Structure formats: C-alpha cells, structure tokens
From Swiss-Prot:
<feature type="binding site">
    <location>
        <position position="115"/>
    </location>
    <ligand>
        <name>GTP</name>
    </ligand>
</feature>
<feature type="binding site">
    <location>
        <position position="46"/>
    </location>
    <ligand>
        <name>Mg(2+)</name>
    </ligand>
</feature>
<dbReference type="InterPro" id="IPR000217">
    <property type="entry name" value="Tubulin"/>
</dbReference>
<dbReference type="GO" id="GO:0005525">
    <property type="term" value="F:GTP binding"/>
</dbReference>
<dbReference type="InterPro" id="IPR008280">
    <property type="entry name" value="Tub_FtsZ_C"/>
</dbReference>
<keyword id="KW-0493">Microtubule</keyword>
<keyword id="KW-0460">Magnesium</keyword>
<feature type="binding site">
    <location>
        <position position="154"/>
    </location>
    <ligand>
        <name>GTP</name>
    </ligand>
</feature>
<keyword id="KW-0547">Nucleotide-binding</keyword>
<keyword id="KW-0963">Cytoplasm</keyword>
<dbReference type="InterPro" id="IPR003008">
    <property type="entry name" value="Tubulin_FtsZ_GTPase"/>
</dbReference>
<keyword id="KW-0479">Metal-binding</keyword>
<dbReference type="InterPro" id="IPR023123">
    <property type="entry name" value="Tubulin_C"/>
</dbReference>
<dbReference type="InterPro" id="IPR017975">
    <property type="entry name" value="Tubulin_CS"/>
</dbReference>
<dbReference type="InterPro" id="IPR002452">
    <property type="entry name" value="Alpha_tubulin"/>
</dbReference>
<keyword id="KW-0378">Hydrolase</keyword>
<dbReference type="GO" id="GO:0046872">
    <property type="term" value="F:metal ion binding"/>
</dbReference>
Length: 380
C-alpha cells in the first residue's frame, strides 16, 4: 500500500509520473542507483513466512539483510521467543536496526507491528522492545498489536502470551494501537467478503495504519507527528492504548450510491462497526481524542463536525480532561490496492480515542488467563 501511495514499483523504481515527489523519503531510503528500499526490518523465528516474501512479487524491493529469520519457530511459547530461540537472533536484529538508524537524517522513532498471541509476536517483540528502550531511550515507540479475538483463537495459550508481553512492554512503549481480529472479520463481512483471508484482514489494517502515518509522509494543512500522538493521547504513561476507528468502510457496490460528507464519516467513527477492538464506548469515558482526516476535507468542515460530535454528549469525557479534539488534516486521499474489496473514496477519517472502554478487552483477557492459570494449564 505504501508503495502504491508513493508511486514505487515492485522493483523499487519510482514511477515516471512521480519523479518530483519527495514524500517517499520518510519511509523509504534511496540507493545510489536511484531505487527505493523500505526502512523496514522483518523478523520471524521460523523461515517459512519470510521465504514467501523473498520469492514473491516484491522480492526485489527488500534488501536481503532486512529479512531476518531463525531456524525454528517459538511454538506459540512466550518463553521460547523471549529467552531461548529469540536470544539467538537478537544481536543480528539489533545490528541491522543500528545500521538503518544511522541511515536516517533525523530518526523520530519506531513503529513496531506484532501480535500478542504467538510466541514470536509476544516473546521476541518484548525482548526487542527491551533492547530498543536501552539503546534508543528517547525515541518514540509506537506499537500496532494484533490482539487475541474473543472467538477466533489461533493458539490455546494466547492469554498467557498476551499478558506476559503486555507486562513486559508496558513501560517501553509510548503508544499502542490494538487491532482485534474479530472486529476486522466483521468489517470484512460488511464489505461483502464472506470468507476473509489474511490478505483481506491485512489490507484493512494497512488502510488504518496508512491514515495514522499519512501526516508523517505527506504534506498537509494540519499534520501530526510521532511525539504529538503521545502528547495528545496519553495522559499517563501506562494508559497508552487508544481505541482506533476508521470510516468510511464501504464496499464498491455501496460506494456508488453514497456520497459521504465530513459530518457523516465523523459520526460513523463513533459507531461500534468502525472500531478496531470490540468494546462498548457508551459505557466508558474519553480521556482524549484525535481525529485524522485525509482527502477532500477543509478545516471548517472538520471543526464543525467535531463540534457537533461534542454537542451530542453521547461521548462522555472525564472531568479532569478538557473535551478537546485534536484534529489532523492531510490532503492526500486514501489509496486502494487492485483487487481490494474496499471502495476508493475521496475522504476518510481515522479516530484515535483514549477511552476507559478499552478496559473491556483487558478484562476478557484477564479472565481467560485466570481461568487457565487456576487449573495450572500448560504450566511446567
């Protein structure tokens, strides 16, 4: 998705029509021969998944040193990812991170994508966060974490892994955006995808991540940088799990019959079907809210829409926090990939809300953890 947004072809060359566009520089580095390489590092403890990238459509895009894999997986075990198998590859990973950091003109921070439920996503990610905090203490660290869904479990020990990784990373991460597989599955069904594949799920997550990072990559009238997310959304360091919502999520069939105004997409962001995590916001209170608009949006419409949301009073704010909405506006409209079920729209909004309602997600996880641990299931 980033490649399409910045006009970068699968072999790393820039599209001829985008030669004057410098927006790619923040997430891609340019080589001496003029091709672009993503500023990314992909790590997995087992080689299978990364092999598919090395042989896939984008095999020429990545530098071989940016795809690091071990010889055996963590077997859905946090301890293997953190203490045994993960320890074996942490040094080459950190060395590559140092090399990439040196290649940046002004490093702002890190975006970490991982899952809570698996052994690598939980164990190795927390080990790496520990090392990042030690070496790059002052740099922002934003996480995008796939949270175990209530009904869709890929491993029976997910509650153990999730609790352990959250405990470890709580003090190292500045802001953590949770994504719940079940909520994404529901979005896929609304888009008319009856049997979603991982590709469909990842594409929805990619749209959300793209909206959050758009202001880091493209010029806009009201841009938000990495440290501003932290400043505006996190009142206390440990309460750093904003609820993410995205609108509009339209299928191509529906898009032909709807012309969504700024007000309508803003209202939709506060509806349950737009949320990335299953929880009831009416039962919680908001501590902070950030609305990131992109596309054909003028500041006047955005301010009117947020004022109307405030006036409704259905979204309760805590007494000790002003009812301010941080607004970001970026003029680049959302891009959709070929074959994607989601329709191309002229404007979209991503809402990041720090609300007490997200505690529902943690309660579900705690209950499962307690249930298993009380029986000493899988404890050795």
């Amino acid at each position: 998705l980033y490649c399409k947004e910045h006009g970068i072809l699968p072999d790393g060359r820039l599209d001829q029509n985008r030669m004057d566009d410098e927006s790619a520089e923040s997430f891609f580095s340019q080589t001496s021969v003029g091709t672009y390489v993503p500023r990314t590092l992909m790590v997995d403890l087992e080689p299978g998944v990364l092999e598919s990238i090395k042989t896939g459509k984008y095999r020429e895009l990545y530098h071989p040193g940016q795809l690091i894999s071990g010889k055996e997986d963590a077997a859905n075990n946090y301890a293997r990812g953190h203490y045994t198998v993960g320890k074996e590859i942490i040094e080459p990973v950190m060395e590559q991170i140092r090399r990439m950091a040196d290649n940046c003109d002004g490093l702002q921070g890190f975006l970490i994508y991982h899952s809570f439920g698996g052994g690598t996503g939980s164990g190795f990610a927390s080990l790496m966060m520990d090392r990042l905090a030690a070496e790059f203490g002052k740099k922002s660290k934003l996480e995008f974490s796939v949270y175990p869904a209530p009904k869709i479990a890929t491993a029976v020990v997910e509650p153990y892994n999730s609790i352990l990784t959250t405990h470890t990373t709580l003090d190292y991460s500045d802001c953590s955006f949770l994504v719940d597989n079940e909520a994404i599955y529901d979005m896929c069904r609304n888009l008319g995808i009856q049997r979603p594949y991982y590709t469909d799920i990842n594409r929805i997550i990619a749209q959300v991540v793209s909206s959050i990072t758009a202001s880091l990559r493209f010029p806009g009238s009201l841009n938000v940088d990495l440290t501003e997310f932290q400043t505006n959304l996190v009142p206390y360091p440990r309460i750093h799990f904003p609820l993410v919502a995205y609108s509009p999520m339209l299928s191509k069939e529906k898009a032909a019959h709807e012309k969504l105004s700024v007000q309508e997409i803003t209202n939709a962001c506060f509806e349950p079907q737009s949320q990335m995590v299953r929880c009831d916001t009416r039962k919680g209170k908001y501590m902070a809210c950030c609305l990131l608009f992109r596309g054909d949006v003028n500041p006047k419409d955005a301010n009117t829409a947020t004022a109307n949301v405030k006036a409704k009073r259905t979204n309760q704010f805590v007494e000790w926090c002003p009812t301010g909405f941080k607004v970001g506006i970026n003029s680049r409209k959302p891009t959709v990939l070929d074959g994607e079920a989601m329709a191309e729209v002229s404007r979209a909004v991503c809402a990041l809300s720090n609300t007490t309602a997200i505690s529902e997600a943690w309660k579900r996880l705690n209950n499962k953890f307690d249930l298993m641990f009380s029986k000493r299931a899988f404890v050795h």
